[in-house]
A protein has these predicted regions:
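N-terminal auxiliary segments of SAM/dcSAM-dependent transferases
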Residues: 1-61
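Conserved alpha-helix/loop element of class I SAM-dependent methyltransferases that forms part
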Residues: 66-91
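Conserved SAM-binding loop of SAM-dependent methyltransferases across substrates and taxa
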Residues: 101-112
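Conserved SAM-binding motif I beta-strand of class I
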Residues: 114-119
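A short acidic, Gly/Pro-enriched loop at the edge of an enzyme's catalytic core
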Residues: 148-159
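A short glycine-rich, Lys/Arg-flanked "PGG" loop and its adjoining helix->strand segment in the class I
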Residues: 173-185
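Conserved class I S-adenosyl-L-methionine
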Residues: 188-222
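Rossmann-like AdoMet/SAM-dependent catalytic core
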Residues: 230-318
């Protein structure tokens, strides 16, 4: 427990927390229902709206009978997940911000790394915590907290990973600036957000869906694959087609965030270099110097390669 406590902090004053969830500095007291610390302070109206959205349908879900081998097989269908797992050292302290039901947190924790999965949706965290117990993973903990006032200690994590989160915040640029403070100098930031180009196919499908009162959603491969899984189909529909807050970003925009916050740009995934072959061993190694025009052309190519699902891309950086 001590190893996890030293990574947490009072969200009010950043003071140390005791084992009974009180702050040594300001005296604030917190609780941990079902073993999940609640270090979330009340948010603004839009943040609370997004939290309520996910409380109704935690995302992504676990199928009946899910096991650790199922989790690994599911994760490793993704080239990115394999590359990420390979790049992170075995003794790393990892934070996943916006972990949802914790599937990536659990996948990374199975290699005996110290992992904290943080989210503002308790219903999702309960599923993740239950899965951790079922899979026998004791190197991972889940906490309920908000990115803008997190119950987490600044500058302590070797890797901060956040995917599918910032584009659902009211101000993604400000949210990124807060996220950067959590990683130690020299540590890695792995950020996944919707791409402005790659999101175009889904936005077109969403337009048709709205105009047809959701009776017609053409050419969505995820819905087609989940035709016989109504719960998972509903979760995808809500997350992709009816989310109350969504932003989309270009690679150049994210690179600007990096520069503003003292983060050295390492690479994009998929690669923003035309003709560059993905290398499983190189996720944390700097790519060749990129040309913004080349990056623009690469992103136009992502319309086809990423647009069949959600259009999410990953940018990797190192805090200086």
């Amino acid at each position: 427990m001590h190893r996890f406590l030293e990574l947490l902090a009072c969200p009010i004053c950043t003071g140390d927390l005791t084992a009974d969830w009180s702050c040594r500095s300001c005296g604030a007291r917190y609780d941990a229902p079902q073993g999940i610390p609640n270090l979330r302070l009340p948010g603004d109206a839009q943040t609370e709206r997004v939290r309520g959205f996910y409380e109704q349908t935690p995302f992504p879900d676990y199928p009946p009978g899910a096991s650790l081998s199922w989790l690994r097989a599911r994760a490793e269908r993704s080239e990115f997940a394999r590359a990420f797992d390979h790049a992170v050292s075995g003794d790393a302290r990892i934070l996943e911000i916006g972990c949802g039901t914790g599937q990536m947190s659990l996948y990374l924790a199975r290699a005996h790394r110290l992992v904290i999965g943080a989210d503002l949706t308790r219903a999702a965290l309960i599923l993740g915590s239950a899965a951790a117990r079922r899979f026998g993973l004791d190197q991972v903990r889940f906490i309920e907290t908000d990115l803008l006032r997190p119950g987490l200690r600044d500058g302590t994590f070797d890797v901060v990973y956040s995917s599918g989160v910032l584009h659902h915040t009211p101000n993604p640029r400000a949210a990124f600036a807060r996220l950067v403070r959590l990683v130690r100098p020299g540590g890695m930031i792995v950020l996944g957000v919707y791409n402005a180009f790659a999101r175009i196919p889904l936005r077109l499908r969403r337009l048709v869906a709205r105009l047809s009162a959701y009776r017609c959603i053409p050419f969505d491969p995820v819905l087609r694959d989940r035709e016989n899984e109504p719960a998972r189909r509903t979760a995808w529909l809500r997350d992709q087609y009816r989310h109350p807050e969504e932003h989309r970003h270009t690679l150049a925009e994210v690179q600007t965030w990096f520069a503003e916050n003292g983060v050295h740009y390492v690479r994009a995934y998929p690669s923003a270099l035309l003709g560059d072959e993905p290398d499983q061993d190189a996720l944390f190694e700097s790519a060749a110097d990129s040309w913004r025009f080349e990056g623009l052309l690469a992103q136009m190519g992502w319309i086809a390669s990423l647009g069949h699902e959600g259009g999410l891309f990953v940018t990797v950086g190192r805090r200086t």
